[in-house]
């Protein structure tokens, strides 16, 4: 804006945003760093000229030293300016970060407020009490359903135990009755051959008994022995 514009109330310039200000400071900072490098190189050149002419041309050497002093003064000023710009940029970056954080927190708070605008703490407590009450009712109903009070309440445990003992005794008696009586063990037939005389005597005795009795079973037994 021109000087007359400022004096007579011309249009005001729009203030830059924080991001734009930070960008401008970074550009200025880079420019000053390049200026520093240039001055440092010039100072080194003037120092070399002074060294070369220290003995053979003192006038040139003195002029080089004077120029070096002026350059060093400029470099010192740039160092101070650069430090100020760096601090200002860091302060703006910190403020920008804080602004972003606060904006995010405010948005979150607004969203939370909108989420709770239709909620009332007393209503929430009442609702939780209702839920707890209904849970108690559901638990009581489950206990009532699972408890077989309505079935078999008139039964006597002693009568049931006595009836069970009678059934066990009955089963035991049936098992005892069903056991077969032991069969008498017959002597085993001799495996050795009988003497001839004993065989003849046995045969004659058996034949005589069969003829006298005329029993068909004895005849069959006799035929087996022969």
From Swiss-Prot:
Effect of residue 93 to R: Unable to rescue null phenotype
Name this protein carries in UniProt: Charged multivesicular body protein 4
A Gene Ontology biological process term: ubiquitin-dependent protein catabolic process via the multivesicular body sorting pathway
Gene behind the chain: shrb
UniProt tissue specificity: Expressed at considerably higher levels in testis than in ovary. Expressed in midgut, eye, mouthparts and male accessory gland.
InterPro entries hit by this protein: Snf7_fam (IPR005024)
Residue segments, region Disordered: 169-226
GO CC annotation: contractile ring; cytoplasmic side of plasma membrane; ESCRT III complex; fusome; midbody; multivesicular body; neuronal cell body; proximal dendrite
Family recorded in the similarity comment: Belongs to the SNF7 family.
Disruption phenotype: Lethal late in embryogenesis. Dendritic arborization neurons have dramatically reduced dendritic field sizes but increased dendritic branching. Increased ectopic axonal branching. Conditional RNAi-mediated knockdown in germline stem-cells (GSCs) of the germarium delays or prevents abscission during GSC division resulting in multi-cell cysts that share a cytoplasm and undergo synchronous cell division. Conditional RNAi-mediated knockdown in germline stem cells (GSCs) of the germarium produces egg chambers with 32 germline cells instead of 16.
